[in-house]
Amino acid sequence: YEVGASRYKHHQHTLMKNTMLIPLVTVTWFLFGWWIYWAFPTGPGLAPSIMNESAALVTDESAFSATWYTATSDLMAVNLGDHISGVFWAAFLLFSWTAASIVSGAIIERITTFAFGILAIAIGSVFWTIDAAWGWHFDGWMLKLLGYHDAYASGVIHAIAGGFALGVLMVLGPRIGKFSSSGEPRNIGPRNPWLVTVGLFLIYTGFWGFYAACNIPIFDLGPEYGMEGISYWTATNIYVTPTTLSGITFNFLMSLSGGLLAGYWIAKGDPFWTYSSGLAG
């Protein structure tokens, strides 16, 4: 998508910038990003007393289960006694890639690959991770104190990545050629509408997969809800509250359709803005 939106002379740079964020964020997510998620659901700096009693609190800084997910932990390697940690780690890693990719699209044609690599590590393995620990964690302080719920991490990812990108853009400024010598803005449209179209439909498909993957484990919540002797097996979201694949399907398709319809109407049928509005929906 981003390659199709960039000008021809920037195609290779845009492609490699987005490709190299994958190994950079993956390695740093392994080394410290995953640990940050488990270490700071209550702060740092907030009272550990807001934690759930079941939380394995190991320090005053609320390092809940952080010792499990250091890079040298047995759970961060091949372990025949552990079937899920790597899958759970990789699922969150996908969101880390997404956060870095959002920033990449916002600062298109304005930055070197090396500089973007630093930003990708910062947003993908540090800043969004802290945000997720606070608001997309079953013991996060935003959930416990504010009742915050974001079942699919939509705000957790896009708010922090968008704010991060805005801060970077305030320093970098507009794309070269965006304004004429008189200060009039120029429209820089996509250079390859077909790549943009294919890319956006791949993103749609990926988002649907994200939403479905947010139905994390299947639990018996009967005892949790006071139904002694009664089993209530259900999919759950990150907050361990019941959800269904049916609800996610309705939510995704209706929001996608609303975005496409609004984009088509506002942009008067322009494909780039129509498809982009579908993504916004």
Where are these regions (language model features)?
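Hydrophobic alpha-helical transmembrane bundles of multi-pass membrane proteins
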Residues: 1-281
